[in-house]
């Protein structure tokens, strides 16, 4: 099997910080005589929402900057919270032949290792403190350790995260009537600009939710049907039924706020409604990975049921 150097990201879109990561990873791959593979999330982002740029365009952006191959992670982020998808993605890369994983961070690899040890020792990878710097990189490192360190971990210094922010880049384009602003162009490789402009001209950007289907389900589904959908507990279902009718996204965000959902769980719950993801579907998916010893003890199905994260409680 060909040995791989792996990157995992959304790249929505690919900016110059990502370009640096790809170039450094390619250099490492050449030194080790390995192949550089970029793994991109497809369908739904790690933030449980639709992508601004579709998979095919992000695929082309990564190849244009030197990746040897682009693979996809699909079917995860409308079904599972991020901390559950990370070990699944790590395992997939290892099964594909990856020996190394490279990422960028503004803290060193030693700092990442030190902060990760607490979570490895406790076997708890869910409650990563929000004030942790580069907490996603810490989570990936900790879960790699949990899986027996199948991947050698590499870290390069990241660009200014406030400046090279995919969220801010996307917002700047949306706020400028779908024209890439001059200042934003400075943050993007030329190949990304060319692909973005082609996608904008073709009307494929930004990606959108299927709001018509979401409104239909939230307005018409019986209590019994809503109870089958993942990430909706009893209190939330009561609020959904009580607050009907839904005609715009804000009315949907508002009902989840009333049910005390935070932004991340709101996006995941709305994605579950959009794709009609059932509690049983999530349970079966998690059990299939438990059987492969991919899921940490604290994240197994029974623990999730005990915490009532996606099982109706009322």
Name each region found by the language model.
Residues 49-50, 65-314:
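Active-site cores that bind ATP or allylic diphosphates and position pyrophosphate for catalysis
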Residues 1-55:
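N-terminal catalytic cores of NTP/NDP-binding nucleotidyl/phosphoryl-transfer enzymes
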Residues 56-67:
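Short, structured active-site "lid" loops
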Residues 15, 62, 169:
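Residue-level signal for inorganic ion chemistry
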């Amino acid at each position: 099997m060909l040995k791989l150097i792996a990157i995992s990201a959304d790249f929505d879109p690919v900016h110059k910080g990502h370009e640096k990561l790809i170039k450094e990873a390619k250099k490492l791959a050449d030194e080790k005589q390995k192949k550089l593979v970029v793994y991109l999330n497809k369908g739904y982002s790690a933030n449980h929402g639709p992508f601004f740029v579709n998979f095919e365009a992000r695929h082309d952006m990564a190849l244009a900057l030197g990746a040897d191959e682009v693979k996809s992670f699909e079917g995860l982020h409308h079904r599972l919270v991020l901390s559950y998808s990370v070990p699944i993605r790590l395992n997939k890369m290892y099964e594909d032949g990856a020996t190394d994983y490279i990422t960028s961070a503004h803290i060193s690899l030693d700092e990442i290792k030190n902060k990760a040890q607490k979570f490895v020792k406790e076997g708890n990878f869910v409650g990563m403190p929000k004030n942790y710097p580069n907490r996603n990189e810490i989570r990936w490192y900790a879960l790699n350790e949990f899986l027996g360190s199948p991947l050698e971990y590499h870290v390069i210094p990241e660009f200014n995260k406030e400046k090279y922010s995919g969220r801010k880049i996307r917002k700047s384009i949306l706020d400028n009537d779908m024209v890439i602003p001059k200042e934003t162009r400075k943050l993007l490789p030329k190949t990304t600009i060319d692909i973005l402009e082609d996608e904008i001209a073709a009307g494929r950007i930004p990606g959108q939710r299927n709001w018509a289907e979401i409104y239909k389900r939230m307005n018409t589904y019986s209590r019994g049907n809503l109870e089958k959908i993942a990430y909706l507990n009893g209190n939330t279902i009561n609020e959904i039924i009580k607050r009907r009718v839904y005609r715009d996204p804000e009315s949907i965000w508002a009902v989840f706020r009333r049910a005390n959902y935070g932004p991340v769980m709101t996006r995941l719950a709305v994605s579950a409604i959009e794709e009609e993801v059932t509690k049983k579907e999530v349970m079966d998916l998690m059990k299939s990975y438990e059987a492969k010893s991919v899921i940490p003890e604290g994240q197994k199905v029974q623990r999730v049921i005990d915490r009532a994260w996606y099982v109706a409680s009322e």
